[in-house]
Structures are given as structure tokens and as C-alpha cells.
């Protein structure tokens, strides 16, 4: 008897990402105009970025530094000698009708980064994704379409050249990615790295991080790649994942029905949750690259390389390894804590001040993160210092206060700061841990509720929670919960 192999197991996706990352320099790559986001259209421009006759571009050295640091963080080989090239194409947002980029001698090549896919059980699957190259280039302007939310229905277009000449690094991955979730995690890890380095804010909504995805599908076991399709217009990590999943499905169905896949560029439409054809894909020969005549070759000295390498911070992957191996945290916890550099810094400072690592992690990931989201602030804005959080964790652990009391006073600590221990003493919230004192309160509660006591002893054992609640009410939550539970059980059975 023959069986049909499910379509999804017959094919595999081959995926690569081209990620454009705006660098956080104060001025543009080849001129002194500001890179400020959100300025009035066409105010941050100058003769150089507009390509006026007779102007000469000069490389912003900070761009070179940031590009090299990004290359080092991605385990790339840094080119001590590289150059810029002109990429020729015609589009309204490109004032010079060419883009200054790097073609055959990029600043960095042959790197890799490791991604982690956290499973439902909290463990992580790790995979290395190769980096083909990293190169420097200038950004283009921005077209603003009017008359419709969609390009196809717009009745007019305007161009803002403020973005023209803003420095970019383009990071090209090897085709090592096999799913939408791997691609989304790769893009997120890139953002973590550039943010840790301080070379970019990685804000996708403002266009500081833009990903183009190349997807092809081939039968499992086939060595040759299928026809590649490029996808653009994804402004979130979830959109990257969904666009890839849709495109894999589309190409698989096309192959199954005998349809030919066309090499083209497609746009992801968020509203319809599908990709639509934009244009046929150009090859590098269509851009007529040639060396940029107005900018001399770039040379990186060994002294510069050593200096920039020494300035690299501890990166997300290094922190995750240390948190798991040294602090015993789960893959999920380490992922959450290292997603933001400042959160990781705060966590480490609290642990260094003596806080139990797991308890500190729980407070940072739970109540503190909820407070930050509610107040729309960052962890740098709270007045609860890391050593105060360590103190809070310690006085819970040593029985000075209960976890409930800690939750009650946390909002005040987050908004006003100060010593948790002093606040607890001032408010008279120190936990009651004296056995005789708690027994006396339990006796009062039982005497005041004879009906409930009779019902409990008649088989309604769930009423134990009622008695615990009454004790907590009388003590304003100060009775030691563990001791209270034990003593009530003993009294009820007596």
C-alpha cells in the first residue's frame, strides 16, 4: 500500500536576511547635516547629500568605528583595506541617482551569530547563522504617498530627503535560516547586539532597523536552491515571521501545481496578511557598480582595531551563558533579562548587592516590568536602586516581611525610592513571626466564627482558606503565611 508524503515534509525553505541598520551618529555619513528623526521635511539636507555639482563627500569616522564594532560583535573578519562604490539606479528618493555603498571590498565578512529558540518547557535550542558580509552605505530619502493608505491607490507622492545620507550598515546573512521563527529571532538578536554596542537604537517603527527577506523553497534532499523571492515592508519581528510563513506556503503550493516561481520583489501587506508582487528582481549587474572616485580607500590600522575591540561590551549571548551557568537561571529568564541592556545592567547590580539571583529576576521580570509598561518609562527612570531591590529580596528571605507586604510597598519604592527596611519599620509592617502571638490571633478568629468552624469539622475543609484570610485581615497581612497555615491546620484538627 502506498502513502502520500505530506506536502510540508517534502519541501524545505531556504531563507536569508538583508538587514539595514541606521547608525546613531549625530551627523550624516559624508556631510555635517543632522540625522535627527522626525524633523520638518527637507530641513536636514545639504549640497553633499543632495548631490550638487562640485561637492566632495568626506567619511564620518564615527561611521567606520561603529561598522567595525558591529563586525567584531558578529565575529567577522575586519578588512584593513576596503573601499566605497557607486550603486547606480534611478528612483525619486535618490537625489544623486546613485547610492554610495560598498561592493566587492566590504568592511567585514565571514561572521556568524547564534540564535536561541526558547521552547515551551523553558529550554533553548541554539543555532549558528552565518554572516556573509557587513558593509557601510548611505540611506536614501523617503517617499510619502497621499490619497490612500496603500501605494497602489495613492494619487500623489512627496519626497523627504532628510534621510538621504544617513549612515547605514547592511548585514547580509548566509542562507542558513529555515523558518519564520528562526528569521524573527535572528533579527531580534541583531537588534540586541547593535543596542548593546550603542551603535543604533534598532527602532523598527522609525525605520532604524529594516529587514528584507529572501525566501526560496526546494524539495528536501535537493542541493540546488529554488528561485529566490525578496520580501519587503515588514515593520515588526512578528511581521517577518508571518510574511515568511505565508511565502513558504505560497511557493510550496505553486510548485505542487506546476506553477513557475518568478524571481521578484514582493511586498508584505499587513492588512491582507499576504505578499503581493512589486517588481521583478534586479541583479547586481543592473546596478552598474564602479569604485567611488571622490572617496579614497579606507584603511583601518591595527591600533584602531585593537582600541575598538577593547571597547566592546559584554554581549547578549555572553550574558545569557553566564546567567545560566553561574546563576542557574532558565533559558527563558536569561532571554527576558538580556533583551534590554539597561535591564540586564540593573539585574546584575542588584545581584552584586547581595540579592538572590532567582528572586531578583522574578521581581524584575514581573512587578517591575509591569510598572514600567504601565507608566511608559524605562528601568533607568525608576528611583528604586538595585541595592534597594537586593535589600527588599533579603528582608523577604529572612522573614522580616511577607511577599504580599513587599508587593504592597513596591509601587511606593518604585516611585519614591529609599530603603525598603526603613519603610517597613516606619509603616509598622514587620512580619509577625512569634508563634504565641499568631496562636492568640488564631484563637480569636476561631472563637469569632463558631459556625464556620463547625462546618469545617463537618467536612468542608475548603474553609481553611477563610480562616487564614481572617488572620491576615486582623494582622493587615503581617502574619507569617507559612507559620499561620501550619498553626491553623493544627488548631482545626485539634
Curated annotation (Swiss-Prot):
Allows the formation of correctly charged Asn-tRNA(Asn) or Gln-tRNA(Gln) through the transamidation of misacylated Asp-tRNA(Asn) or Glu-tRNA(Gln) in organisms which lack either or both of asparaginyl-tRNA or glutaminyl-tRNA synthetases. The reaction takes place in the presence of glutamine and ATP through an activated phospho-Asp-tRNA(Asn) or phospho-Glu-tRNA(Gln). This is Aspartyl/glutamyl-tRNA(Asn/Gln) amidotransferase subunit B. Its EC number is 6.3.5.-. Keywords: ATP-binding, Ligase, Nucleotide-binding, Protein biosynthesis. PROSITE patterns: GATB (PS01234). It comes from the Bacteria. It catalyses: L-glutamyl-tRNA(Gln) + L-glutamine + ATP + H2O = L-glutaminyl-tRNA(Gln) + L-glutamate + ADP + phosphate + H(+); L-aspartyl-tRNA(Asn) + L-glutamine + ATP + H2O = L-asparaginyl-tRNA(Asn) + L-glutamate + ADP + phosphate + 2 H(+). The keyword Oxidoreductase does not apply. InterPro entries: Asn/Gln-tRNA_amidoTrfase_suB/E, Asn/Gln-tRNA_Trfase_suB/E_cat, Asn/Gln_amidotransferase, Asn/Gln_tRNA_amidoTrase-B-like, GatB, GatB_C_1, GatB_Yqey_C_2, Gln-tRNA_amidoTrfase_suB_CS. Belongs to the GatB/GatE family. GatB subfamily. GO terms for molecular function: asparaginyl-tRNA synthase (glutamine-hydrolyzing) activity; ATP binding; glutaminyl-tRNA synthase (glutamine-hydrolyzing) activity. One of its GO terms (biological process) is glutaminyl-tRNAGln biosynthesis via transamidation. HAMAP family: GatB. It comes from Trichodesmium erythraeum (strain IMS101). Heterotrimer of A, B and C subunits.
Amino acid at each position: 500500500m502506498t502513502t502520500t508524503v505530506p506536502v510540508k515534509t517534502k519541501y524545505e525553505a531556504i531563507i536569508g536576511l538583508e538587514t539595514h541598520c541606521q547608525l546613531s551618529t549625530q551627523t550624516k555619513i559624508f556631510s555635517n547635516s543632522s540625522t535627527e528623526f522626525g524633523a520638518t521635511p527637507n530641513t536636514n539636507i545639504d549640497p553633499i547629500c543632495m548631490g550638487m555639482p562640485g561637492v566632495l563627500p568626506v567619511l564620518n569616522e564615527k561611521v567606520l568605528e561603529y561598522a567595525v564594532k558591529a563586525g567584531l560583535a558578529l565575529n567577522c573578519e575586519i578588512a584593513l583595506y576596503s573601499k566605497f562604490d557607486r550603486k547606480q539606479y534611478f528612483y525619486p528618493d535618490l537625489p544623486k541617482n546613485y547610492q554610495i555603498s560598498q561592493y566587492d571590498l566590504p568592511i567585514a565578512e565571514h561572521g556568524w551569530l547564534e540564535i536561541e529558540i526558547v521552547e515551551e518547557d523553558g529550554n533553548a535550542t541554539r543555532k549558528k547563522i552565518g554572516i556573509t558580509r557587513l558593509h557601510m552605505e548611505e540611506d536614501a530619502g523617503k517617499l510619502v504617498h497621499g490619497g490612500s493608505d496603500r501605494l497602489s491607490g495613492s494619487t500623489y507622492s512627496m519626497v523627504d530627503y532628510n534621510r538621504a545620507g544617513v549612515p547605514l550598515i547592511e548585514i547580509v546573512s548566509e542562507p542558513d535560516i529555515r523558518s519564520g521563527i528562526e528569521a524573527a529571532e535572528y533579527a531580534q538578536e541583531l537588534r540586541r547586539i547593535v543596542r548593546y554596542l550603542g551603535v543604533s537604537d534598532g527602532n523598527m517603527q522609525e525605520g532604524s532597523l529594516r529587514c528584507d527577506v529572501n525566501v526560496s523553497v526546494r524539495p528536501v534532499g535537493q542541493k540546488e536552491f529554488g528561485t529566490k523571492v525578496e520580501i519587503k515592508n515588514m515593520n515588526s519581528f512578528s511581521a517577518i515571521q508571518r510574511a515568511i510563513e505565508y511565502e513558504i506556503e505560497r511557493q510550496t503550493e505553486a510548485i505542487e501545481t506546476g506553477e513557475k516561481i518568478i524571481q521578484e520583489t514582493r511586498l508584505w501587506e499587513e492588512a491582507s496578511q499576504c505578499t503581493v508582487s512589486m517588481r521583478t528582481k534586479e541583479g547586481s549587474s543592473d546596478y552598474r557598480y564602479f569604485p567611488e572616485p571622490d572617496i579614497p580607500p579606507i584603511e583601518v590600522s591595527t591600533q584602531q582595531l585593537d582600541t575598538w575591540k577593547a571597547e566592546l561590551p559584554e554581549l547578549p549571548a555572553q550574558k545569557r551563558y553566564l546567567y545560566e551557568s553561574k546563576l542557574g537561571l532558565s533559558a527563558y529568564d536569561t532571554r527576558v533579562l538580556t533583551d534590554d541592556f539597561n535591564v540586564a545592567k540593573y539585574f546584575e547590580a542588584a545581584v552584586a548587592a547581595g540579592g538572590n539571583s532567582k528572586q531578583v529576576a522574578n521581581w524584575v521580570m514581573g512587578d517591575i516590568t509591569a510598572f514600567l509598561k504601565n507608566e511608559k518609562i524605562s528601568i533607568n527612570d525608576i528611583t528604586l536602586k538595585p541595592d534597594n531591590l537586593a535589600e527588599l529580596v533579603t528582608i523577604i528571605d529572612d522573614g522580616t516581611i511577607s511577599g504580599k507586604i513587599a508587593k504592597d510597598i513596591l509601587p511606593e519604592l518604585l516611585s519614591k525610592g529609599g530603603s525598603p527596611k526603613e519603610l517597613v519599620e516606619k509603616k509598622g509592617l514587620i512580619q509577625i513571626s512569634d508563634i504565641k502571638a499568631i496562636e492568640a490571633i488564631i484563637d480569636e478568629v476561631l472563637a469569632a466564627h463558631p459556625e464556620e468552624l463547625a462546618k469545617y469539622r463537618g467536612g468542608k475543609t475548603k474553609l481553611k482558606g477563610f480562616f487564614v484570610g481572617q488572620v491576615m485581615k486582623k494582622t493587615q497581612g503581617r502574619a507569617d503565611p507559612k507559620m499561620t497555615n501550619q498553626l491553623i491546620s493544627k488548631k482545626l484538627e485539634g
